[in-house]
Swiss-Prot record:
PANTHER family (alphabetical): LARGE RIBOSOMAL SUBUNIT PROTEIN UL18, RIBOSOMAL PROTEIN L5-RELATED
Name recorded for this polypeptide: Large ribosomal subunit protein uL18
Gene3D superfamilies for the chain: 3.30.420.100
CC terms in the record's Gene Ontology section: cytosolic large ribosomal subunit
Gene name of the record: rpl18
BP GO annotations: ribosomal large subunit assembly; translation
Family annotation (HAMAP family): Ribosomal_uL18_A
Subunit organization: Part of the 50S ribosomal subunit. Contacts the 5S and 23S rRNAs.
GO molecular-function terms, A-Z: 5S rRNA binding; structural constituent of ribosome
Biological role stated in the UniProt entry: This is one of the proteins that bind and probably mediate the attachment of the 5S RNA into the large ribosomal subunit, where it forms part of the central protuberance.
Family under the similarity heading: Belongs to the universal ribosomal protein uL18 family.
Origin species: Methanosarcina acetivorans (strain ATCC 35395 / DSM 2834 / JCM 12185 / C2A)
Cited SUPFAM superfamilies: Translational machinery components
Keyword terms of this UniProt record: Ribonucleoprotein, Ribosomal protein, RNA-binding, rRNA-binding
Amino acid sequence: MATGPRYKVPFRRRREGRTNYHLRLKLLLSRQDRVVVRKSSRNVQIQLIAPTPDGDITYSSAVSNELAKYGYTGATGNTTAAYLTGLLFGLKSLQKGYEGGILDIGLQASSAGSRVYAALKGVVDSGFEIPCSPEVFPPDERIRGEHIAGYREESSDLPEQFEATKEKIFAEFS
């Protein structure tokens, strides 16, 4: 299939839609640790990754499934869970001695107010240093889950549950 001088096959991970090599090169040349945020419909995953010649090393990570340990019973794929996961990740990383990094959202669309930026706000609120503009963060009402509590009866206590979970996370790492 890839024969002849006029045809170039992209790298496998580019073909699969998993890696933007131009962005990855810029991030690697910065020589800073990357705070990688990945989301699915059910979870949000955040990792602190450092590049090395032998391959990337993961220093710290948090997944929204871990919020159940802190009493959070809501959905783990929403904006509220993304913020709490970012907060948990930031406090874990600070406890391990890491102080900052740069955001890596990969091939995800960069939309102000999205779950990616809710997770970033959680990381920044924990005290972890990431250069960013506060204009991209979602409103506090969305982070607390008031928009969900307004239309879903099962989640009517989500803002209170958010505050309780946030206090438990801070209590564990203080």
